[in-house]
Amino acid sequence: GGLPFNNQFIPGHEYMGTVVKLGPSVDEIGLGERVAVEIHAGCGRCKRCRQGMYTSCHNYGKNYGSQDKGHRANGYTTDGGFTEYAVNNINTLIRVPEGISDEEATLIVTAGTATYGLDVLGGLIAGESVVVTGGGPIGLLAIAVAKTLGAAPVILTDIENNRLEIGRELGADITLNARDVNVVEEVRKISGGPGCDYVMECSGAPNALNEAA
């Protein structure tokens, strides 16, 4: 399958903004406050949503003709962050504290994705090794998160040297260009065994997914 992408919607799925209008009965946040915006608003009714897995909502993309019901994915099934004004469910908003710039706040949800994968789902323990495949925004922030959690070594693979360089700046201990080396063999050499403790696949490339497995 594929994403139910609709070209009529303005893109931008992880972003921040300033609240300029509130819906009826909204009192959790105030006008003028800065917020980071999570991509998904689940329908709240299907089995997945009731289990807390709203990013896999069974009603993905079905708005039922209303902003108040149905699943929405910013930039995919409703207008996203590149529009001037966007309507978002209160459950998708994260208040941005003072001291964090707008530019930094834009990365809150992306960093949260990496943190959730490594810490909550993965249960990473300091001293365990991590390979991150793909040096895009989530992959690069996964490097920073892994280092913060005490992972060692932290290895980044990509096919672009500029992304590998950014990865080193963010804390990657080792970087591998997948065009130049056999990543699986190199990781086995580095680990001195079958491989690393964790692989976080962030590229979406079929080859990288197979190698991660």
Where would I find each of the regions flagged by the language model?
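Mid-domain Rossmann-like dinucleotide-binding core that forms the NAD(H)/NADP(H) cofactor-binding site
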Residues: 91-93, 97-181, 185, 198
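Conserved amphipathic alpha-helix within the SDR
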Residues: 183-193
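Glycine-rich beta-strand-centered segment in the early N-terminal region that forms part
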Residues: 2-50, 55, 97-99
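Short, well-ordered coil/turn residues at beta-beta hairpins
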Residues: 38, 200-202
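Conserved acidic residues
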Residues: 33, 84, 173, 197
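Rossmann-fold NAD(P) dinucleotide-binding segment
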Residues: 206-213
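Short SAM/SAH-binding signature in class I
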Residues: 194-200
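Cysteine-cluster motifs in flexible loop/terminal segments that predominantly coordinate metals
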Residues: 28, 38-92
